[in-house]
Amino acid sequence: PYEYQKEGIAYALEKKRCIMGDEMGLGKTAQAIGTMTASGAFPALVICPASLKLNWQREFRKFGGINAIILDDSNRNVWQNILRMKRADGKPFAQVVITNYESLKKFFVRRLNRQERFTLKSIEFDERVHLFRSVIIDESHKCKSNKTQQSKFVQGIAQGKEYVLELTGTPVVNNNMDLLQQLNIMG
């Protein structure tokens, strides 16, 4: 890693919750993987746009030598068992689960309780969200509104995690309020 990436990793290791807001192409993914590898805060969940899931899987293998599984319908009910599996050398078979924003409800929300106002308390999460020690949220500016279900799902999943890393090249899209929900997600 470059010197500025080493500084980013050191900062994330110290703070445990941060927004990596570098411009595109400066290695936010490598910094996040470096932070997870150095901290050992596995299992980790990566939440990213659907088009980036394969990239995250490749990058974890390339930069960290870590197997990552992409959550889909075929492993929907068994992924937690895959995290417990060991290879012949005794190391975990996989330490990272990757999913996209649009699948959070399908995989991690048990029920939405009807209330007059939709809040974080309206969501009943699947207990498997507690298996993760850390969460990486790629393109975190997608969570700029505190009113959307997607932002609330991310916030609820991130609660209580040892590490919460938010990656975005544009932390503020329209106005400074865009940053507020991203900060709420960090806790």
Language-model segments: which ranges?
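PAPS/PAP-binding and catalytic site of the sulfotransferase fold
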Residues: 33, 59, 175-186
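A broad structural signal for alpha-helix termini and local helix breaks/kinks
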Residues: 64, 186-187
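Residues at the beta-strand->loop junction immediately N-terminal to the Walker
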Residues: 21, 47, 168
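Conserved helicase ATPase motor motifs in RecA-like P-loop NTPase domains
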Residues: 24-25, 161-176, 184
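SF2 helicase/translocase NTPase motor core
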Residues: 1-11, 17, 26-150, 156-160
